[in-house]
Curated annotation (Swiss-Prot):
It comes from Homo sapiens. This is Zinc finger protein 48. Belongs to the krueppel C2H2-type zinc-finger protein family. Residues 1-51, 78-109, 157-189, 235-271, 392-457, 500-540 are annotated as: Disordered. There is a cross-link at K87, K179, K269, K329, K477, K610 (Glycyl lysine isopeptide (Lys-Gly) (interchain with G-Cter in SUMO2)).
């Protein structure tokens, strides 16, 4: 029996660490044979001990529990006991069995904990990398563009974008074992859902970041100015403003949009948004945000609203749109408590409390709190040729004659002759080569109103205005009041109506806006006539009728009252053509044209009176 143990015993240690007499001192007899537990059964291969399982003698019984030495509770503890010492030796670098942790690896009782957020790690190196997310340290710099990274592996991945290297190739199906598919979460299932707004996320970390928009928590502080941020990436972008750094430009060349399209994007923060949309000129910080935005210009829109039928390219846009119908406003202002349906609207509102004006005009150094206000202001500095379209150069504007004196009417111009059928054109408006072909309508200019109402022929510049106007003819009111159930055709009308439930009054206009003459640039042929608004009599009823002096709390009530003086009746009945000054009066009138079918006869629907004879009802 001892002959069978001798070939295996010396192979337990490497040649330079071989101790022939060690088995006698530790109590290992000739009958004690070391064997691996059943859970470590694997294919014969060389492991950390330096031998193979197939090298064992064929007459050994592997897995006999009776052969375990005395005092050894686990087979993994065999190699750490040295000559009566019952604990591992820290400086030992000998072989280790399977399942034994490496030296220097933190165990459960020696976990490395971050002092900022309390997150724990098994190794100190992982804690050092994690702390760079709090300090913003980026010691690894790219040699091509100079971009910094907190981890060396991130820099290696980034450098492949410059070199074009693709080291990972797909393995042919014939080589290697079959690939086992991982269990992934289906695209339609998102387990993490926000309890405030109902938005779903794929990862719990994204839900934690999103919930900070509701709670206002900002754990990441700037070390220079102390400003807080809810995301570490937002703090990194903010710190570029202190260091004067600019983000790297995209490698793919992009077509520069026109000056009119990028008028509002050339402010002081334009350098932080290198990705530009070629369709509308909007800038973005991340390329993924640009790709998500371009879906709104082209591609299908699978997300449709069940209330008004409007379609969206992203589900998040549909969630925001549904708040218009439900009146939900989950984003509250911490200063005044006002609610907003969108987080960006709350950010713009907070500027009214802080007085921040981040958008500056490069022409006159005037600052604005909104980018849309800056865009309208910059149009006053631009020349007419800046509004030309590709293929349709805009000629010099013909100076208009001075207006007639007050009290006189302008002279009537004769009618133009009938159209002969030839293409109509103006000098200087011939399309350039490469422009739109013949027969295609030119794009609408700034003063055109291409969207016409088929009922009354009124024109609008935007299609959304036409949709709102068309509700006047159809009587549709998709915006319902959650308190009393009253419907409104416009969301702003519902907002004004909600003030009556809360006991609020309409705000009077500030004194600075009552008299504001318009001074256009350039020489003025005659002094403009200022428009004088009616002075409000008090803060509770600012709207006064100019005919009889009656006061109203809302401007809509004043508009309805003026129709009693002017005789205007814009709401026409589709059956008899009778006009009404109020839409509610027309609805009451139209009920007289309908007759209800008794229960059990027909389909039970309301029909016009002209169909009464056909139904056989008296």
């Amino acid at each position: 029996m001892e002959r069978a143990v001798e070939p295996w015993g010396p192979d337990l240690h490497r040649p330079e660490e071989r101790e022939p007499q060690r088995g006698a001192r530790t109590g290992l007899g000739s009958e004690n044979v070391i064997s691996q537990p059943n859970e470590f059964e694997h294919t014969p291969q060389e492991d950390d001990l330096g031998f193979k399982e197939e090298d064992l003698a064929p007459d050994h019984e592997v897995g006999n529990a009776s052969l375990k030495p005395e005092g050894i509770q686990n087979w993994d503890d065999l190699w750490v006991q040295r000559e009566g010492l019952g604990k591992p030796q820290p400086r030992d670098r000998g072989p280790r069995l399977l399942g034994e942790p490496r030296w220097g690896q933190a165990s459960s009782d020696r976990a490395a904990v971050c002092g900022e957020c309390g997150k724990s790690f098994r190794q100190m190196s992982d804690l050092v990398k994690h702390q760079r997310t709090h300090t913003g340290e980026k010691p690894y710099k790219c040699g091509v563009c100079g971009k910094g990274f907190g981890d060396s592996s991130a820099r290696i991945k980034h450098q492949r974008t410059h070199s074009g290297e693709k080291p990972y190739r797909a393995r042919p199906p014939a080589q290697g074992p079959p690939k086992i598919p991982r269990s992934r979460i289906p695209a339609g299932e998102r387990p993490t859902i926000c309890g405030e707004c109902g938005k779903s996320f794929r990862q719990s970390s994204d839900l934690v970041k999103h919930q900070r928009t509701h709670t206002g928590e900002k754990p990441y502080k700037c070390g220079i100015c102390g400003k807080g941020f809810g995301d570490s990436s937002a703090r990194i972008k903010h710190q570029r403003t202190h260091r004067g750094e600019q983000p790297p430009r995209p490698v793919v060349p992009r077509r520069q949009p026109s000056r009119a399209a990028t008028a509002a994007t050339q402010g002081p923060k334009a350098q932080d948004k290198p990705y530009i949309c070629t369709d509308c000129g909007k800038r973005f910080v991340l390329s993924c945000s640009l790709l998500s935005h371009q879906r709104s210009h082209l591609g299908p829109k699978p997300f449709g609203c069940d209330v008004c039928g409007k379609e969206f390219a992203r589900g998040s846009d549909l969630v925001k749109h549904l708040r218009v119908h439900t009146g939900e406003k989950p984003y509250l202002c911490p200063e005044c408590g006002k609610g907003f349906a969108d987080s960006s609207a709350r950010v713009k509102h907070l500027r009214t409390h802080s007085g921040e004006r981040p958008h500056a005009c490069p022409e006159c150094d005037r600052t604005f709190s909104l980018s849309s206000t800056l865009l309208r202001h910059r149009l006053t500095h631009m020349e007419p040729q800046d509004f030309s379209f590709p293929g349709y150069p805009l000629p010099a504007l013909i100076p208009s004659p001075p207006p007639p004196p007050l009290g006189t009417s302008p002279p009537l111009t004769p009618r133009s002759p009938s159209h002969s059928g030839e293409p109509f054109g103006l000098p200087g408006l011939e399309p350039e080569p490469g422009g739109p072909q013949a027969g295609e309508p030119p794009p609408p200019l700034a003063g055109d109103k291409p969207h016409k109402c088929p009922e009354c022929g009124k024109g609008f510049r935007r299609s959304s205005d036409l949709v709102k106007h068309h509700r006047v003819h159809t009587g549709e009111k998709p915006y319902l009041c959650p308190e009393c159930g009253k419907g409104f055709a416009d969301s702003s009308a519902r907002v004004k109506h909600l003030r009556t439930h809360r006991g609020e009054r309409a705000r009077p206009p500030p004194p600075s806006t009552l008299l504001r003459p318009h001074n256009p640039p350039g020489p003025v042929p005659m002094a403009p006539r200022p428009r004088v608004r009616a002075q409000p009599s008090g803060p509770s009823q600012p709207h006064v009728c100019g005919f009889c002096g009656k006061e109203f709390p809302r401007s809509s009530d004043l508009v309805k009252h003026r129709r009693t003086h002017t005789g205007e009746k814009p709401y026409k009945c589709a059956e008899c053509g009778k006009g009404f000054g109020d839409s509610s009066a027309r609805i009451k009138h139209q009920r007289g044209h309908l007759v209800l079918t008794p229960f059990g006869i027909g389909d039970g629907r309301a029909r016009p009176l002209k169909q009464e004879a056909a139904t056989g009802l008296e």
